[in-house]
Design a protein with these regions (language model features):
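Interfacial transmembrane-helix boundary/kink motif in multi-pass membrane proteins
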Residues: 13-26, 42-72, 94, 124-133
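Alpha-helical transmembrane segments in multi-pass membrane proteins
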Residues: 1-42, 89, 97
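Short alpha-helical transmembrane interface motifs in multi-pass membrane proteins
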Residues: 16-21, 28-31, 69, 101-103, ...
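Transmembrane helix-loop-helix hairpins at the membrane interface
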Residues: 79, 92-214
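Juxtamembrane "helix-exit" motif on the non-cytosolic side of transmembrane helices
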Residues: 2-11, 72-85, 145-154
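Structural signal for membrane-spanning alpha-helices in multi-pass inner-membrane proteins
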Residues: 35-40, 66, 70, 74, ...
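Membrane-interface helix-loop-helix regions
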Residues: 60, 64, 78-96
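Alpha-helical transmembrane segments and immediately adjacent membrane-interfacial amphipathic helices
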Residues: 31, 69-77, 110
Length: 214
């Protein structure tokens, strides 16, 4: 089980079921969203105050520009087969369902654990924004150690997997951290560099197959 479904497995047709998806999504929601929010609330945290501090109009150009880059980039580069082979109804239901389960299993856990708990506390300890962004990136890479494609079956593949994740996902995490450090809004990355952007072209057809959407 990892940050992005199906964890350390590589998805193939009929390799995973709807039950697998919901177990992953609900487990990550409970462990990395609900319980941490309860902990934050006991320490005086207020979601109402957090949302009232956002400046959506100021940040709108960032959201649109980077969402477009992260959404269309994989499609135009040919790294995903998002276009073609399915009908409009499958697109509509597959995209909606994918956003829902990815929000529960990946989006909200990252928002809460990284952007609402880790980054604000690191920002208090370090004056350098770059240091905060770098440590945020490293945190995200650790969060990604059980993402699809890694292999911990032997010492050699374990070292290769860890090295690969840290080298690639640290940069991704730094991008996510930058949005929060610059805007103060932990949800900007959620739209621009996560669930509503790249995960849509990468995951839609997988969820259409798993949930047998016609």
């Amino acid at each position: 089980m990892g940050l992005h479904f199906p964890g350390t497995d590589v998805y193939t047709t009929r390799s995973h079921t709807q039950v697998d998806v919901w177990i992953w999504a609900l487990t990550y929601t409970l462990v990395y969203t609900v319980l941490p929010l309860i902990w934050l609330k006991k320490r005086g945290f207020s979601l109402k105050k957090l949302f009232s501090s956002f400046r959506w109009i100021r940040d709108l150009w960032i959201i649109i520009a980077y969402w477009a880059l992260d959404f269309f980039g994989p499609i135009l580069s040919g790294s995903t087969n998002f276009l073609g082979g399915i009908n409009a109804n499958q697109y509509a239901q597959g995209i909606s369902l994918g956003i829902l389960v990815n929000t529960l299993g990946a989006g909200l856990p990252v928002v809460v654990m990284m952007h609402m708990i880790f980054i604000p506390r690191i920002a208090v300890l370090f004056k350098s924004k770059f240091t905060v962004i770098l440590l945020g990136g490293l945190f995200y890479s650790i969060f990604s150690l059980f993402d699809p494609g890694v292999d911990y079956g032997s010492m050699e593949t374990t070292l290769t997997s860890i090295t690969y994740i840290i080298m690639t996902q640290t940069l991704v995490g730094m991008g996510k951290s930058t949005f929060t450090v610059v805007t103060g809004n932990p949800f900007v990355h959620f739209i621009t560099l996560h669930v509503i952007s790249a995960r849509v072209p990468f995951d839609t057809k997988m969820y259409i197959e798993i949930f047998k959407i016609k």
